[in-house]
Amino acid sequence: MLGRPFGAPSEPHVQRRVLRHLLSLFEHPSGPVLDDFPEDAPVAGEATSFACPVSFASAKPRDGGLAGAVLEEIAELGPWYELARRRRGRTTVGVFGSTAEAAARHVLSYVKGAPEATPNPAWSPGMAVKRACDDLKAYYYEAVAAQPGNLDARAIENWFWMETAAAQAFLAIRDYCLKSNDESLKPLGKLSLIPRFVTDGK
């Protein structure tokens, strides 16, 4: 991460002051000019600790098992995801299909040991799984980023991998990929699905 050169997210007043200060540097008769901004930017989580308004009860599988827990999480995050999409005017969800639920069901079909066919015949199983996982992770990340607290990327990543049922599904599908004879799935299990800090801690 390159930090926050223009201030914290969702702080337009601070960001404007930073930009005005930057533009004022062009008024110096000679340069280059190295000047400190007179204010300290608030650190993510400094004023408000992260208390996600949606609690997943440590992501323990519920009556519907892991699949039910993932789909329940998606439903609970839905209002936050929609808020994020309206604020930004766009979303990165959609490389697999039109909804996070569709991506989740594809991922979960592998967890259950009965993989669905790829939605696009041009995609290999590995490509479909990767796209579905990317969609699912983007949905969670965008939803939680819309919640109060100004979380940084590391906090969001830790929350996803340590506290959600979706992360448990990713770990399960990684095991499937590692044991698979499909050459498009094996690299996912070895390299692409799970960050090293998660697998090293297993």
Which residues does each predicted region cover?
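Charge-patterned, long linear interaction tracts outside catalytic cores
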Residues: 32-99
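Extended non-globular C-terminal regions
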Residues: 83-202
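Conserved, well-structured core segments that form the ligand-binding/active-site neighborhood
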Residues: 1-55
